[in-house]
């Protein structure tokens, strides 16, 4: 009974180093891209195969190679230790922007699954996280005012808030002036507004 050898991208995803090496020895580039621009390096990073990543880089892999969405392997990273190696050992560029104008830290933050990883990536940039859950209460108040005053996101060219959200923030701020504690309400609406903004700009990640 014959078996089919998995292609290099599946082998890299599964961490099958021996199969990946056979593909490399047969002449396939570590930078070979599938129809979506996805490379073996993207796969190794996404699934956390550090030993395989090392081999791919040693065989000429480009750590900052982009897929069709303009995303480098750093964008699909899910583990702190892999991110550490990408940046400190392989010199991955944390400032690369994808086709939507977002850096890896912003994309990972927007996905919401790996907040510590996003925070780590932000530490290598001049940008600040937009997660309002990490903001002090007074800062949430000022952030709410800023979002109602700033009509457009300059990078995306889209409204930061719709009219309904602006009206709700105005209502909450008015309640605060009467002495009512509105921190939880502000947190919820700001989180929702930011999530909606990112959903318009970030493609869903898939395994």
From Swiss-Prot:
Cross-referenced Pfam families: Ank_2
Extent of the ANK repeats: 36-65, 69-98
Domain of life: Eukaryota
PROSITE patterns documented for this protein: ANK_REP_REGION, ANK_REPEAT
Compartments it resides in: Cytoplasm; Nucleus
SMART domains: ANK
Gene3D superfamilies (alphabetical): Ankyrin repeat-containing domain
InterPro entries: Ankyrin_rpt, Ankyrin_rpt-contain_sf
Keyword entries, A-Z: ANK repeat, Cytoplasm, Nucleus, Repeat
GO cellular component: cytosol; nucleus
Record-linked PANTHER family: ANKYRIN REPEAT DOMAIN-CONTAINING PROTEIN 39-RELATED (PTHR24171)
Protein name: Ankyrin repeat-containing protein P1E11.10
Organism placement in taxonomy: Eukaryota, Fungi, Dikarya, Ascomycota, Taphrinomycotina
């Amino acid at each position: 009974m014959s078996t089919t050898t998995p292609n290099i991208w599946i082998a890299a995803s599964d961490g099958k180093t021996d199969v990946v090496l056979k593909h490399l020895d047969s002449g396939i580039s570590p930078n070979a891209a599938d129809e979506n621009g996805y490379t073996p390096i993207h796969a190794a990073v996404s699934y956390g195969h550090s030993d395989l990543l090392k081999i791919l880089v040693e065989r000429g892999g480009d750590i900052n190679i982009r897929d069709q969405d303009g995303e480098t392997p750093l964008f699909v990273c899910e583990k702190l230790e892999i991110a550490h190696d990408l940046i400190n050992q392989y010199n991955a560029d944390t400032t690369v922007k994808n086709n939507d104008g977002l850096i890896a830290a912003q994309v990972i933050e927007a996905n919401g699954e790996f907040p510590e990883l996003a925070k780590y990536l932000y530490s290598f940039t001049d940008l600040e996280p937009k997660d309002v859950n990490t903001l002090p209460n007074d800062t949430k108040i000022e952030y709410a005012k800023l979002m109602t005053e700033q009509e457009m996101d300059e990078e995306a060219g889209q409204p930061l808030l719709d009219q309904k959200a602006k009206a709700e923030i105005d209502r909450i701020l008015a309640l605060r002036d009467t002495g009512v504690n509105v921190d939880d309400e502000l947190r919820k609406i700001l989180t929702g507004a930011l999530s909606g903004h990112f959903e318009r700009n970030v493609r869903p990640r898939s395994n």
